[in-house]
Structure formats: C-alpha cells, structure tokens
C-alpha cells in the first residue's frame, strides 16, 4: 500500500473473488455462473441500434426496466431499485441502514462481502454462528437492535430457510431493517417478495447473475417498501446516478420477459444438481441439501484443499474456502450434464491416487 492510503483503510481485508482464468481453458465450476447462454431475447435486445446509443448516458431512473420488474414481481416501480449487481444493492443498504453505532448481524459462514463492507465502512459486526449442521437458527436473530442480513439460500452451504422462518425474524425486529439476500432463490428457495407489502422493514435483494445468465452484465434488484427504496436511492444519487449501463438495462428487461427460457434453464440446473448430488453420495461424499445452483460437499478420504488443487491441476475449477469449520468442504457450481460428468470422472481419478 502507498503512504497516501487513509489510515482507516489500512486494516481492511478486501474480498477475494473466485478465479477467472484468462490463460487456460477449465471446466469452470467455481463462481456459480450459469452454464447456459443468455436468453435469445437478451441477444436481440442488445442490438446494434443500442450499441450506437452508448454515446449517451443511460436512464438514471431505469424507467423501462422498473416497469417490467414491477409487473414480474407484483410490486410498484417505486418499490424496486436496480443496482450494478446485487453487490451494489447490498452495499447501498449497509450504507443506508448501518453506521459506526448501528451494527450488522450476519452468520459466521455466509457471503464474504458482508464482513468486507463492514470493515470498509467501520460498521460493527455481530457474527452469529450457524449450528453444527450449518443450518441457521432464526431465533438467534430475534430481538436484535441491529440491521440483519440473511442470505437465503445461504452461500456457500446452499441451505435455505422457509419464508415463515424469515417472517419470524421480521416480526421480532420491527424497528430494524432485515435484508434477505436471495441471489440463489430461483433454484429452490422460497422468496420473501410476497412479504414486502406486509413488512416495511423488509428488503429483498436478487441478482440476474445466476438464473438469468447475466453475471457479466452486472444487474441486481433491491425490493422493499417505497420508503426503504427511497433511502437506497438517496445513496445512489449521492454516488453514481448512472449506475446501470444502457446495454444492461435492455438485457435485464429482456431476461425478465423471457419466462420460457428462464424456466427451461432453471429446471435443467435443478435436475443436474439432483443427479450430481446422487453421484457424489454414491461415492461416499457428504453433500448438503442445496437449494442453490451449487453443491457443498466433503469427504473424509481427502482434504478439501488437496482436492481443490488436484482438480485445478487436471483442468476443473471448484471453490475452496480456507476458513474455520469449512476448510474440508468444496463448493461446486452446477454446470451442464456434460461438464458435471467430466468433473466426476476427474474426481474419480483423483480419489484412486
């Protein structure tokens, strides 16, 4: 670091994203991207005509996308705010609803950016351990005088709470915002969007990166009461009014409108997940009951870090977290059936060594 860096940032540990290799071809099962191409409707929407408009700023109000999203989710446009990826939505939420005297409560094993953002903004963290089986006990979040964020389904475990459990947390914290990070909800979770009109302290965040094949476009949605969304827009318009580029606005709108393609690819991933889970269990691996587009798995026969490195050496990328309680587990993104067969064949060779 340079001598000019603010002392407040010297102790911040930045987030470590999953590998994005540029120099070698891998079976890439490490960052929970979709293995399928974007919808043909998206390709058509991002036309040459739209490319020519890149000389102009995008619509800061995201008008057309909001109209489409409002119809899709059964909300009003003023209950939704698009973000440059759901990460931006979440960051804005922490900026709006937390500060140095108002902590953020979250699980010890969950999305790593929560702790990074707390460090960056000097927000106290209240870290709540998951149970021994990696499930989250909603009662641990009752009656906290803190902002709460729950990834549901959780990452990297893939486990999900029913909507009723989240509702219990909302009821027990009427004076604090409860953020539900639903990045993976389309693969088997139960969305809390239907609760928005009943709880003005609920903020739901979803992404287009996983189930709508737009990870590279960077688009997320925050959904909640009109007053919560107004708070987020206060942050947005104080930082970057043009946060969504023109092509992403068109791509996101088209992705929401193509329900047939969404369901086809979503179902394919869920089916492949079930088959892969069965195959891993037949090989003696422990596999959590994922409701996401990945599996969290371990074996007593080999160390998780060792498996990760050997798979990478043989051309298969998965995710390993060198962290307490999960150092022997791997997170494996669900790819196409062909990709998962290659993964399993490679795994078999390693296990025979």
Regions found by a protein language model. Give the residues of each.
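Active-site phosphate-binding strand-loop segment of PLP-dependent enzymes
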Residues: 130-186
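PLP-dependent enzyme catalytic core of the Aspartate aminotransferase-like
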Residues: 164, 310-314, 319, 323-353
């Amino acid at each position: 670091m340079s001598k000019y860096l603010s002392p407040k940032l010297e102790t911040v540990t930045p987030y470590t994203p999953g590998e994005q290799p540029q120099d070698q071809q891998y079976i890439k099962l490490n960052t929970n991207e979709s293995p399928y191409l974007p919808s043909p409707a998206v390709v058509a929407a991002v036309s040459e005509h739209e490319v020519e408009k890149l000389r102009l700023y995008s619509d800061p109000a995201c008008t057309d996308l909001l109209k489409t999203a409002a119809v899709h989710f059964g909300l009003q446009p003023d209950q939704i705010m698009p973000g440059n990826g759901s990460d931006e939505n979440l960051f804005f939420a922490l900026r709006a609803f937390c500060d140095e005297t108002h902590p953020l409560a979250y699980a010890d094993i969950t999305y790593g950016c929560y702790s990074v953002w707390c460090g960056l903004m000097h927000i106290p963290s209240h870290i709540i351990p998951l149970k021994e089986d990696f499930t989250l006990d909603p009662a641990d979040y009752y009656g906290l005088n803190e902002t709460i964020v729950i990834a549901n389904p959780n990452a990297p475990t893939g486990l999900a709470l029913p909507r009723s459990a989240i509702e219990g947390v909302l009821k027990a914290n009427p004076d604090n915002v409860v953020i539900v990070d639903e990045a993976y909800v389309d693969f088997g979770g139960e969305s809390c969007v239907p609760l928005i009109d009943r709880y003005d302290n609920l903020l739901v965040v979803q992404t287009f990166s996983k189930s709508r094949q737009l990870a590279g476009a960077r688009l997320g949605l925050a959904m909640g009461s009109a007053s919560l969304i107004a708070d987020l827009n206060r942050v947005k318009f104080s930082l970057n009014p043009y946060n969504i580029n023109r092509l992403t606005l068109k791509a996101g709108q088209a992705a929401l409108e193509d329900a047939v393609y969404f369901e086809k690819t979503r179902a394919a991933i869920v089916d492949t997940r079930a088959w892969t889970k069965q195959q891993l269990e037949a090989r003696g691996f422990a596999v959590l009951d994922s409701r996401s587009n990945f599996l969290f798995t371990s074996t007593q026969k080999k160390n998780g870090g060792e498996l990760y490195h050997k798979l990478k050496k043989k051309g298969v990328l998965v995710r390993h977290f060198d962290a307490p309680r999960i150092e022997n587990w791997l997170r494996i993104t669900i790819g196409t059936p062909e990709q998962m067969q290659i993964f399993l064949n490679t795994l078999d060779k390693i296990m025979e060594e």
